[in-house]
Amino acid sequence: MKKNTDSEMDQRLGYKFLVPDPKAGVFYRPLHFQYVSYSNFILHRLHEILTVKRPLLSFKNNTERIMIEISNVKVTPPDYSPIIASIKGKSYDALATFTVNIFKEVMTKEGISITKISSYEGKDSHLIKIPLLIGYGNKNPLDTAKYLVPNVIGGVFINKQSVEKVGINLVEKITTWPKFRVVKPNSFTFSFSSVSPPNVLPTRYRHYKISLDISQLEASNISSTKTFITVNIVLLSQYLSRVSLEFIRRSLSYDMPPEVVYLVNAIIDSAKRITESITDFNIDTYINDLVEAEHIKQKSQLTINEFKYEMLHNFLPHMNYTPDQLKGFYMISLLRKFLYCIYHTSRYPDRDSMVCHRILTYGKYFETLAHDELENYIGNIRNDIMNNHKNRGTYAVNIHVLTTPGLNHAFSSLLSGKFKKSDGSYRTHPHYSWMQNISIPRSVGFYPDQVKISKMFSVRKYHPSQYLYFCSSDVPERGPQVGLVSQLSVLSSITNILTSEYLDLEKKICEYIRSYYKDDISYFETGFPITIENALVASLNPNMICDFVTDFRRRKRMGFFGNLEVGITLVRDHMNEIRINIGAGRLVRPFLVVDNGELMMDVCPELESRLDDMTFSDIQKEFPHVIEMVDIEQFTFSNVCESVQKFRMMSKDERKQYDLCDFPAEFRDGYVASSLVGINHNSGPRAILGCAQAKQAISCLSSDIRNKIDNGIHLMYPERPIVISKALETSKIAANCFGQHVTIALMSYKGINQEDGIIIKKQFIQRGGLDIVTAKKHQVEIPLENFNNKERDRSNAYSKLESNGLVRLNAFLESGDAMARNISSRTLEDDFARDNQISFDVSEKYTDMYKSRVERVQVELTDKVKVRVLTMKERRPILGDKFTTRTSQKGTVAYIADETELPYDENGITPDVIINSTSIFSRKTISMLIEVILTAAYSAKPYNNKGENRPVCFPSSNETSIDTYMQFAKQCYEHSNPKLSDEELSDKIFCEKILYDPETDKPYTSKVFFGPIYYLRLRHLTQDKATVRCRGKKTKLIRQANEGRKRGGGIKFGEMERDCLIAHGAANTITEVLKDSEEDYQDVYICENCGDIAAQIKSINTCLRCSKLNLSPLLTKIDTTHVSKVFLTQMNARGVKVKLDFERRPPSFYKPLDKVDLKPSFLV
């Protein structure tokens, strides 16, 4: 039998992308783009940003200038490894230093004279501390010689106190396509942003808006707040491009529907009316008058010529070095899109489309912060020079200003969850599953405030542009992040590019475009504009567009431009544009190439025989036309076939319509979804729930769990899954394990395992089945004098402390034990007291319900004593703990049964877990049964024909029929035992066994589904969720229980709880809980006249309202709760009067008694 058929070739090519590619420097594919992004920043971009020479101040017509120069930028890696940082409890940072020189330049007749003002050679070990990204194998970009730890995938920052931090990738707010908006009927706006190229520092941003109102076409203006004049868009285009209005009319009308042509004519006519309304109209004079008016309006200190130069030169910063004529043609192309979008809005990429957005990776976060903080640093120096000159008449800078760049605080805030002051981007990594080291850095999310502010935003829906590039299963199912965070598919990555590479690539592309005949790339009237990163460079002959794009794609794949991730998009549909994208932050993934109706994979006969010995980069080099890296914009405007199978079923004419072909369905899932099994065989919601539960599964031990004082939950005896996918294997998820194999039975057990209830075997627990260890960090800060005080009275809370005031190592802490000495003392002002010193314990107590062993203690002595304690606890499954399969069959332990209580098979084997059999039908998880069947088949034949151990490949999403898996299981059993009868073979294939009742030892009537499966333990543990207590801490204001388990909180008893007890008739219980306890009892005097609470003045209760009116009302004492008194007081303070009134009814003894007739009834 042939090892690999043609239909498997696409799958094998997809697998090649997932595995490491050392020839291309890819050692861990899932996070490679993050490593490259960060290394580009710290090795290259940081030097470019910090190396500055520019004027701070200028005087006397720019003949005297105060200059600043920052040079000698040096980045030094730490001397120790990440594990040493964890042991020390320190952060893992690189040190950046630089030299600052501030001098005065004076232009004289002899030349320029330079006078030194101030300088600072930064050698401070805390000048700029940059958190280092720890890559695969504990490596960092600055020191790749660190020892390799293969199973440590990295992708984290170690923040202060050895806490790991990871973050998601945010969608950039600036869009690469203008945003179309309907303001009101017949009124529209078209807004866009222009950002200078990466080689221009500091980065310049401009935001423009084109407005159009059908009722006032003369006011079709472009404007920008304080950076540009408000001018008619058609006249501005004419001014820049130096063409006639008829030229603009023909350019806008070319290849447009009739309704758009009608609007074009109306707009051009309105522009003509403006020109005709002005005598001797001249376009230059018209623009100059508008600039002068804006100059007067802004009260600018610049001269009119300088003001005009600044405004027009900085117009469209992304085309900074482009002639004005090309800027004018670019404005015409924008107006063309705008007019078309008015009538055909659905065909234009909306603002939520990923086509319009770039994505911020780790390196871009640090780059943006470095930009902002450097500008703040230079601004502080400028202000300090101005203040010193104003106050003392000298140009001087305080050394404190020079030595505080501010980057440390910005980077620290970034790792604490704040990006650009208000936008949250990072979160602390939860240590119950290191799978989130993969999932979080590969997540893409929107700014939270971006969604709240914009009423038009509809990203909560799965946008069509996310198809293939994002995992449709791994999305938040509930909460505020629904629809705002998406997981990249396994083939997707985010582009990175150095500034030098960017400039070289731009130069090569421009040279290629200019190699065409000059007239063919100068069709500015009716041609297709060619843009590089939105900057117009040429306009192509419409008859050559297909040949140009095809040739460009071929050259790109062959490495002609030196970059295989260049995106080229042919935008048709009347918008007519060729967009070439080379920047960072684009989503890219590989596709199979279709050229002239042929799948190029099929045209290369040598590929199949050589594929096993090649890496992905080898395929791109030796067979360049088989696979193409395509960005999301190119994909959106291309014709892509869904699968190779569908492509081969088409006719030849149909095939010629396609440009690309996709890989099999399993490559559309993310890495978390790839840990599931057969989600396409289940109902839809199971995939979303399964991804959420897989990230909550407790994984194996971390490499330095005992050194790291941090919270974590770790599986003690993990097992590698038998049924896996290729993505699960290449991402190291399978090798690092996140569960155990257990034997399950699908049946009912005495009515106990109803709904989500499961039965678990006691002996399975005792043997360490799904046993975990919990690591917990406890941190306290104690004033030094309190720590040094000695306790005067022996306290049980201090029984676990050493003489040095710290908890003993290996001590078992119980609830109420102190972790460090904290004794507050106070002196009484009593001359007659023998001992006027009193002391009391104020230490923070251990509050968990379970005992924990002290593993590690760290102390830092500053003005306060900072004590950090790491406790460890082995925790076996108990009632209420949650478990799940990889098909989202979550269950809660309902009963722990002894082995003697459980049914057994003919070999005496009892199930480890019994699951309710009806859950399969209600949740429709057929793939769970398939997983059991495949795992059991593996146990029958765990080795392939070469004697090698082979796991079973069962991808998360697959196009394989269930019959194929049944056939595989049949072959396994027939190989191990060829003498089985048909009935016995069928029972083994479908895992059906006869079980025996443990009480009667008689077989059950029906066969039971019985077999092994990979089972996960979730982080939802019963003892971590229990917060019920009767006594403990209370808040000072309302004297009720604290909120939150971490703060020792309890149940807050309020109105709803009261209503529940009323419904049960528990009046006495309400009185006891709400009023009768010592702390909550409150005597209150109420004025019977106005209903106010009486005030106590010098031990006399009086009603303030009535006393001012000289009234003497009756005060009645009532007993109530303290919470009620606080509520009434706060309502009164807010101007809300709450009147307490008394029920008016006469006493019962004032009523005359009814007459009683004592005569016998028979006499009546």
Swiss-Prot record:
A Gene Ontology biological process annotation?
DNA-templated transcription
Q: Does Signal show up as a keyword for this record? A: no
Q: Which Gene3D superfamilies does the UniProt record give?
A: 2.40.50.150, 3.90.1100.10, DNA-directed RNA polymerase, subunit 2, domain 6, RNA polymerase alpha subunit dimerisation domain
Provide the Gene Ontology terms for cellular component: DNA-directed RNA polymerase complex; virion component
Supply the enzyme class, top level.
transferase
Q: State the oligomer form and interacting partners.
A: The DNA-dependent RNA polymerase used for intermediate and late genes expression consists of eight subunits (147) kDa, (133) kDa, (35) kDa, (30) kDa, (22) kDa, (19) kDa, (18) kDa and (7) kDa totalling more than 500 kDa in mass. The same holoenzyme, with the addition of the transcription-specificity factor RAP94, is used for early gene expression.
Q: What's this protein's family per the entry?
A: Belongs to the RNA polymerase beta chain family.
Identify this protein by name: DNA-directed RNA polymerase 132 kDa polypeptide
Question: Can you name the source organism?
Answer: Cowpox virus (strain GRI-90 / Grishak) (CPV)
Recall the taxonomic lineage recorded for the source organism: Viruses, Varidnaviria, Bamfordvirae, Nucleocytoviricota, Pokkesviricetes
